[in-house]
C-alpha cells in the first residue's frame, strides 16, 4: 500500500469532518430539509398511520400555570429483546401519565421502530416505522440507527408538543415527569463515563477550538433528555452525521466504543449551542443505586446478581439474578421470582414493576 495506504484514513477522516461542518451549516439555516445521502425522496420511507394523537403543544391549568407538554419517543428494533422492554415501558408510561392528572406535562408517546416494516404490536404501542441505515453502514453497531430514525420521525411527523423526551426501551417511569427543560436549555442525566475533557484530542476533530472550550460538551447521551422540538430538529441531522463519521474514524471508534453515539449527541448538542441542565435525579441505575427515592426513571441496564443472603455478587452470576440480557430471545416469564431479603429497594421495585406489567399486558410471551 505504501504512502497511499498511509494517507487514505486521514483523508477519509478529513472528508468526513468537512461533511459534518457542511451539515451543521445547512441544518442551522434550514432545519431538517436534508435527507440521508443517496435517498432521492422521502416518499420511499414508510410511515405507520397508527400514531397516538398528541394533546397539544401547551395549555394552562386551573392555576393559570402554563403546561409545557413533551412527547416521549423511544427508538427500538423489532427484536424480541427490544420489543418486550418497549411493552413494559409503555405500560408504565400510560399508568403514570394517567395518575398525574390534568396538569401533567407528559404528552403523547411514540415508539420509533427502525426495522423498516410494521410488527404485530402496532395497535398496542403508538408507532412510527423508520427505515434502517443501508446495509453495512452501521458496521455492526446497530445503535447508529437511532439518530437516523429520529431524523425521519422529526421530518415526517406532525408532533404537536413543543418538547421531546428521548427515552429508551429499558426505562421504567416510576412517577410523573415534569418538563425539566427551561430557558432554552435541555434537561439531561449526567453519565460518569462521558468525559469530554479526557478525550479532548479526539473530540476537537468534531468540536473545533473556535467553538469554545471542550467543557461546552455536556457529559450526556441522548437519553434521557428533554429538549425543545425545534432544537432537536437542528441537532438530529448533525447527530446522525457525527455518529457516522466517528464510527469511520478508527481513533474515535476505539476511544468511545459502545458509547460512541452518546458522545456524538453531546457534541451535536454543543455545536448547535444547546446546553443542558444536568439532573442526577432524572433516573437511577440498579443495582448501584439502591433507593428509588425521588427519581423519575429506573434504567435497568446493569445485571442484578445476589446470593440468597441479599449480598450483591456483581461480576459473578448470583443465586438470584435479574439481567435483561437473559431474555434476548424470549420475554421474561410472568411472575418473576422476587429477590431474597436484604436486596436493595431499587431492585425489589424494578422486579415488582416488571411483574405488574407482564401480568396486565395481553398475550404476554406470545
Swiss-Prot record:
**Reaction(s) catalyzed by this protein?**
trans-4-hydroxy-L-prolyl-[protein] + UDP-beta-L-arabinofuranose = O-(beta-L-arabinofuranosyl)-trans-4-hydroxy-L-prolyl-[protein] + UDP + H(+)
The species this protein belongs to is Arabidopsis thaliana
Q: What class of enzyme is it?
A: transferase
Q: How does it sit in the membrane?
A: Single-pass type II membrane protein
Listed disulfide bonds for this chain? none
Main location per UniProt?
Answer: Golgi
Q: Which gene encodes it?
A: HPAT1
Q: Which residues cross the membrane?
A: 6-26
Record key words, sorted:
Glycosyltransferase, Golgi apparatus, Membrane, Signal-anchor, Transferase, Transmembrane, Transmembrane helix
What superkingdom does the record give? Eukaryota
Q: Tell me which GO cellular component terms the UniProt record holds.
A: cis-Golgi network; endosome; Golgi apparatus; Golgi medial cisterna; plant-type vacuole; plasma membrane; plastid; trans-Golgi network
Q: In which tissues is it expressed?
A: Ubiquitous.
- Effect of knocking it out? No visible phenotype. Short-root-hair phenotype. Hpat1 hpat2 double mutants have longer hypocotyls, are early flowering and show early senescence in leaves associated with a decrease in chlorophyll content. Hpat1 hpat3 double mutants have an impaired growth of pollen tubes, thereby causing a transmisson defect through the male gametophyte. Hpat1 hpat2 hpat3 triple mutants fail to produce detectable levels of Hyp-arabinosides, have low fertility and shorter pollen tubes.
Gene Ontology MF terms: hydroxyproline O-arabinosyltransferase activity
* EC number annotated for this UniProt entry: 2.4.2.58
Q: Which protein is depicted?
A: Hydroxyproline O-arabinosyltransferase 1
Q: Which InterPro entries match?
A: HPAT-like, HPAT/SRGT1-like
Q: What does this protein do?
A: Glycosyltransferase involved in the O-arabinosylation of several proteins including extensins and small signaling peptides. Catalyzes the transfer of the initial L-arabinose to the hydroxyl group of Hyp residues. Contributes redundantly with HPAT2 and HPAT3 to arabinosylation of EXT3.
Q: Where in the cell is it found?
A: Golgi apparatus, cis-Golgi network membrane
Amino acid at each position: 500500500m505504501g504512502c497511499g495506504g498511509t494517507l487514505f484514513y486521514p483523508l477519509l477522516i478529513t472528508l468526513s469532518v468537512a461533511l459534518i461542518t457542511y451539515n451543521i451549516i445547512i441544518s442551522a439555516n434550514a432545519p431538517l430539509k436534508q435527507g440521508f445521502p443517496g435517498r432521492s425522496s422521502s416518499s420511499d420511507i414508510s410511515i405507520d398511520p397508527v400514531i397516538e394523537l398528541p394533546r397539544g403543544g401547551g395549555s394552562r391549568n386551573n392555576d393559570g400555570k402554563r403546561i409545557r407538554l413533551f412527547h416521549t419517543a423511544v427508538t427500538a428494533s423489532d427484536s424480541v429483546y427490544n420489543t418486550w422492554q418497549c411493552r413494559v415501558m409503555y405500560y408504565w408510561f400510560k399508568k403514570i401519565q394517567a395518575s398525574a392528572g390534568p396538569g401533567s406535562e407528559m404528552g403523547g408517546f411514540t415508539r420509533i421502530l427502525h426495522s423498516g416494516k410494521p410488527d404485530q404490536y402496532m395497535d398496542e404501542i403508538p408507532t412510527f416505522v423508520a427505515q434502517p441505515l443501508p446495509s453495512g453502514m452501521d458496521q455492526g453497531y446497530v445503535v447508529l440507527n437511532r439518530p437516523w430514525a429520529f431524523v425521519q420521525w422529526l421530518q415526517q411527523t406532525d408532533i404537536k408538543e413543543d418538547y421531546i423526551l428521548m427515552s429508551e426501551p429499558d426505562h421504567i417511569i416510576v412517577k410523573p415527569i415534569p418538563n425539566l427543560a427551561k430557558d432554552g436549555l435541555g434537561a439531561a442525566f449526567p453519565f460518569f463515563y462521558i468525559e469530554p475533557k479526557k478525550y479532548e484530542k479526539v473530540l476537537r476533530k468534531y468540536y473545533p477550538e473556535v467553538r469554545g472550550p471542550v467543557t461546552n460538551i455536556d457529559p450526556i447521551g441522548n437519553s434521557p433528555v428533554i429538549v425543545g422540538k425545534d432544537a432537536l430538529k437542528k441537532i438530529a441531522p448533525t447527530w446522525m452525521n457525527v455518529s457516522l463519521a466517528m464510527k469511520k474514524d478508527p481513533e474515535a471508534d476505539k476511544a468511545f466504543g459502545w458509547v460512541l453515539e452518546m458522545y456524538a449527541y453531546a457534541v451535536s448538542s454543543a455545536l448547535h449551542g444547546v446546553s443542558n441542565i444536568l439532573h442526577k435525579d432524572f433516573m437511577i441505575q440498579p443495582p448501584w443505586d439502591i433507593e428509588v427515592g425521588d427519581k423519575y426513571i429506573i434504567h435497568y441496564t446493569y445485571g442484578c446478581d445476589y446470593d440468597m443472603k441479599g449480598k450483591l455478587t456483581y461480576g459473578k452470576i448470583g443465586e438470584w439474578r435479574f439481567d435483561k440480557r437473559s431474555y434476548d430471545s424470549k420475554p421474561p416469564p410472568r411472575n418473576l421470582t422476587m429477590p431474597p431479603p436484604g436486596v436493595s429497594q431499587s431492585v425489589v421495585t424494578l422486579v415488582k414493576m416488571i411483574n405488574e406489567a407482564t401480568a396486565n399486558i395481553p398475550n404476554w410471551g406470545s
